């Protein structure tokens, strides 16, 4: 397969090129932020933050409904703004993982991806779909780990450009294709893929039943779907102010229309026709000394090697100040759009919600579900 067979020119792509320029090909992190079109960046900032009020107590049902209806704009604007900071502060794999003593951050991230592929039973040469593939970190790891042929689906042009660039650098461009598309209306024929997976991506859907239904449709009969889902626990109660504050901080900080509970995810996957083979909240097996959220705490004493210090430092109070002042300097000299530092502030809101959600066990980013499409239609 060739990664050059992408999509015809369209408005989103033109705007993406105007905003990001050649950043997708050559730059990462703060250098990528500095290379963006200032006017277009300002427009994206305004577009994203019009969906949110910083105070969850001011949120209305109409606000939530507007985010759900405008999910494509919410998610696209979010990742146009946050992708570079994710790569700078985390990795090319935009997800969490569990940690074992002595295990480096990068090894933990890769093991988490391998574990999903292993539990799904992905075989060499099979056709696999990655739903919401980000910049392709998990896709590259799973392609190399299993020997599969992979299609990555993403609705963000900037991230697709980065996927293609990285695939070429890793000599995977013959094994991977990245396609622009809405996962609520996938641009694939029925019964196309042997396996479909999603890693912390379908949480951005306005309806889990909707996105799971599309996954069911494009899977071949007997095909397997594996997902790490972001969900609130079944103890979550939106009428409790602290519970709602935690969920809202996760939503506003991560571009999520609306968080749901574990039971809602299970109901959705069964309702579209899947046979649910396995469900397991992997945070239940967490190392209490190294919880999944420890890199967000900025506690470098928990780092398992010297290289992890750099990752964890960026989430510390001092690390966030360094990033904020660096971005504010770029704003001051006119290289970055005014308000760009607000993106970092938004990620800090998410950081607070994720840590509190982890500490209270009200939230998990790794609710594993493995499901199978029946061999024949019911």
Swiss-Prot record:
- To which pathway does this protein belong? Steroid metabolism; ergosterol biosynthesis
Annotated Gene Ontology cellular component terms = endoplasmic reticulum; nucleus
- UniProt keyword list: Endoplasmic reticulum, Lipid biosynthesis, Lipid metabolism, Methyltransferase, Nucleus, S-adenosyl-L-methionine, Steroid biosynthesis, Steroid metabolism, Sterol biosynthesis, Sterol metabolism, Transferase
Q: Which SUPFAM superfamilies match?
A: S-adenosyl-L-methionine-dependent methyltransferases (SSF53335)
UniProt main location, coarse: nucleus
What does the record give as EC number? Answer: 2.1.1.-, 2.1.1.41
Q: What is its induction? A: Expression is anaerobically up-regulated via the sterol regulatory element binding protein sre1.
Citing just one GO molecular function, the answer is: sterol 24-C-methyltransferase activity
Q: What happens when the gene is disrupted?
A: Abolishes the production of ergosterol and leads to abnormal cellular morphology. Leads to susceptibility to cycloheximide and to staurosporine, but does not affect tolerance to nystatin and to amphotericin B.
Q: State whether keyword Endoplasmic reticulum applies.
A: yes
| Keyword Heme carried by entry | no
For this protein, the record's InterPro entries field holds:
Erg6_SMT_methyltransf, Methyltransf_11, MeTrfase_SMT, SAM-dependent_MTases_sf, Sterol_MeTrfase_C
- Compartments, as annotated in UniProt: Nucleus; Endoplasmic reticulum
Q: One biological-process term from Gene Ontology?
A: ergosterol biosynthetic process
| Catalysed conversion reaction | zymosterol + S-adenosyl-L-methionine = fecosterol + S-adenosyl-L-homocysteine + H(+); lanosterol + S-adenosyl-L-methionine = eburicol + S-adenosyl-L-homocysteine + H(+)
Name the job this protein performs: Sterol 24-C-methyltransferase; part of the third module of ergosterol biosynthesis pathway that includes by the late steps of the pathway. The third module or late pathway involves the ergosterol synthesis itself through consecutive reactions that mainly occur in the endoplasmic reticulum (ER) membrane. Firstly, the squalene synthase erg9 catalyzes the condensation of 2 farnesyl pyrophosphate moieties to form squalene, which is the precursor of all steroids.
Query: What family, per the record?
Result: Belongs to the class I-like SAM-binding methyltransferase superfamily. Erg6/SMT family.
An additional note in the Swiss-Prot or TrEMBL entry is: In Aspergillus, the biosynthesis pathway of the sterol precursors leading to the prevalent sterol ergosterol differs from yeast. The ringsystem of lanosterol in S.cerevisiae is firstly demethylised in three enzymatic steps leading to the intermediate zymosterol and secondly a methyl group is added to zymosterol by the sterol 24-C-methyltransferase to form fecosterol. In Aspergillus, lanosterol is firstly transmethylated by the sterol 24-C-methyltransferase leading to the intermediate eburicol and secondly demethylated in three steps to form fecosterol.
Q: Which PANTHER family match?
A: HYPOTHETICAL LOC100005854, ZGC:194242
**Protein's name in the database:** Sterol 24-C-methyltransferase erg6
What is the taxonomic lineage of the source species? Eukaryota, Fungi, Dikarya, Ascomycota, Taphrinomycotina
């Amino acid at each position: 397969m060739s990664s050059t067979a992408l999509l015809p020119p369209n408005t989103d792509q033109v705007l993406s090129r105007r905003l990001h320029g050649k950043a997708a090909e050559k730059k990462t992190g703060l250098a990528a932020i500095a290379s963006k079109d200032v006017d277009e960046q300002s427009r994206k900032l305004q577009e994203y933050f019009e969906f949110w009020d910083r105070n969850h107590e001011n949120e209305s049902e109409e606000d939530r409904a507007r985010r759900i209806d405008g999910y494509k704009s919410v998610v696209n604007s979010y990742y146009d703004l946050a992708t570079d900071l994710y790569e700078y502060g985390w990795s090319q794999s935009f997800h969490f993982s569990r940690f074992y003593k002595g295990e480096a951050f990068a090894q933990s991230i890769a093991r988490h991806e391998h574990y999903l592929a292993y539990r799904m039973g992905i075989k060499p040469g099979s056709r696999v779909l990655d739903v919401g593939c980000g910049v392709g970190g998990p896709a590259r790891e799973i392609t190399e780990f299993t020997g599969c042929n992979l299609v990555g689906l993403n609705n963000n042009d900037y991230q697709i450009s980065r996927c293609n660039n990285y695939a070429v650098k890793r000599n995977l461009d013959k094994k991977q294709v990245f396609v622009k598309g809405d996962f609520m209306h996938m641009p694939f024929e029925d019964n196309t893929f042997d396996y479909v997976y999603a890693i912390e991506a379908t949480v951005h859907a306005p309806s889990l039943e909707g996105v799971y239904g599309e996954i069911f449709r494009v899977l071949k009969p007997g095909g397997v779907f594996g997902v790490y889902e972001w969900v609130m626990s079944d103890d979550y109660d939106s009428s409790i102010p602290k519970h709602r504050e935690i969920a809202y901080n996760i939503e506003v900080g991560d571009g999520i229309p609306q968080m749901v509970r574990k039971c809602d995810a299970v109901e959705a996957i069964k309702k579209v026709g899947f046979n649910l083979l396995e469900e397991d909240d992997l945070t239940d097996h967490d190392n209490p000394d190294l919880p999944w959220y420890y890199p967000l705490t900025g506690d470098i004493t928990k780092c398992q090697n010297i290289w992890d210090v750099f990752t964890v430092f960026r989430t510390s109070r001092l690390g966030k100040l360094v990033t904020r002042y660096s971005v504010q300097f770029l704003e001051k000299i006119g290289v970055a759009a005014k308000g760009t530092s607000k993106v970092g502030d938004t990620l800090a809101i998410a950081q607070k919600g994720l840590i509190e959600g982890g500490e209270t066990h009200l939230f998990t980013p790794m609710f594993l579900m493995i499901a199978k499409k029946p061999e024949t239609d019911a």
